[in-house]
Amino acid sequence: FTAAGQEAQYVRYRRLLSGYTVQHVYSAAAYRLDPAMSLRQAADLMLLGGQKSFAVVEGDTVVGFLPGQDLVSALHSSRPFVPVAELMRRHVEPVMPGEELIDVERRMIEEQIDALPVAFAGRYLGLITHDQIITLRRLASAAAPMAPPRHTAANSPAN
């Protein structure tokens, strides 16, 4: 009966997140890292802003991703002055603003990461975290009839 309970919970989660996309919750103000920055500098940003994971960006292009768990592990190995470029994951594809949150959450779980970079037309826009998705789900659950905001030209990623 555990599998049936998990399936029912997944259906409920899917219903709560239905219609919500990345653009509804991602943070455009998230810190980003330059590949030449040291891991120590990345850790300083982690402490300063409470952000766990980071997009690695050159110009406006995402070139990698540094999950918090990778950063902490490297710092425990006494490697604070290693450049971010040596540790970053190079094959983490950014998500787009129009992607459904349920799909983004599933991908985070599968890839075992707590955040993903957000990009549109190859340009870095920000970061979406699993915590943001969980918070939205809790808000939607508390206000069950709450409908997702409508997509308008004013909140489109092109503006």
Model-predicted regions and their roles:
Residues F1-A36, A143-N159:
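Membrane-interfacial segments at transmembrane helix termini in multi-pass membrane proteins
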Residues R32-G50, V56-E58, L75-H76, E86, ...:
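The conserved cystathionine-beta-synthase
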Residues K52-S53, G64:
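Conserved active-site beta-strand-loop modules that form the wall/rim of enzyme catalytic pockets
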Residues V62-P67, L125-T129:
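Amphipathic coiled-coil signal-relay and dimerization helices
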Residues Q69, S73-A74:
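Bacterial c-di-GMP phosphodiesterase catalytic domain signature
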Residues R90:
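Short proline/glycine- and basic residue-enriched helix-capping loop/turn segments at helix->loop/beta transitions
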